[in-house]
């Protein structure tokens, strides 16, 4: 049987769809099996997609921008609703920093190619600064990011929901800035162009099931 290899991250619509088993049922009449591959972040997922290790996946809009800029040849198929407040940068509650300008020359935790990095670049540009004006500390997982924050080894950390909301509850922190006015922070679904062209019937079923799941999860 043919297989669709889907990359997903936790706490996302694809992850919920995986849990329901509905996609497997919907694709069975087409003789398609589903293989699920979990990734820690959208950056790694997009790299796997570009390398041909998976066929279909999702990531935040910032990651898609980086991938397109690098000429990796991914095609956007659909986008979920904007969620600019779902990505942001935290500082300690008693921190003297009041805006992104105050991070000049400071160590800031973000993921390489993540929506947090894209948001940081946009925030710095909006403040008349460049990415080179901060010292980025690249961290892969949300838990390591929170650990760096708690250790005080960075001035600010970039996180995305549900980790952003969770960290605000678990740590003595406040949001210095989020994606509002800087990035839509949509979740995009994309594939390799050749896969999308050859498998429109399969992708139609995938999106029908995603739409049902999205309606249910909201």
What are these regions (language model features)?
Residues 1-131, 136-140, 155-161, 176, ...:
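Short, glycine-/small- and polar/acidic-enriched structural segments
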Residues 62, 136-137, 142-218:
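Pocket-lining segment of extracytoplasmic ligand-binding domains
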């Amino acid at each position: 049987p043919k297989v669709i290899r889907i990359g997903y991250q936790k706490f996302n619509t694809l992850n919920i769809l995986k849990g329901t088993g509905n996609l497997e049922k919907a694709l069975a009449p087409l003789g398609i099996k589903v293989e699920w591959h979990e990734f820690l972040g959208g950056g790694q997922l997009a790299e796997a997609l570009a390398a041909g290790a998976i066929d279909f996946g999702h990531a935040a809009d910032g990651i898609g921008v980086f991938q397109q800029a690098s000429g990796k040849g991914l095609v956007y198929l659909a986008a979920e609703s904007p969620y600019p407040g779902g990505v942001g940068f935290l500082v300690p509650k008693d921190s003297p920093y009041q805006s992104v300008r105050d991070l000049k020359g400071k160590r800031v935790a973000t993921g390489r190619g993540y929506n947090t990095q894209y948001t940081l670049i946009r925030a710095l540009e909006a403040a008349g600064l460049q990415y080179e004006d901060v010292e980025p500390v690249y961290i892969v997982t949300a838990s390591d990011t929170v650990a760096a924050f708690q250790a005080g080894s960075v001035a600010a950390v970039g996180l995305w929901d549900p980790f952003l909301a969770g960290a605000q509850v678990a740590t003595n922190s406040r949001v210095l800035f989020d994606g509002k006015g800087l990035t839509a922070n949509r979740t995009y679904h994309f594939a390799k162009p050749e896969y999308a062209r050859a498998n429109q019937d399969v992708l139609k079923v995938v999106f029908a099931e995603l739409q049902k799941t999205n309606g249910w999860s909201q």
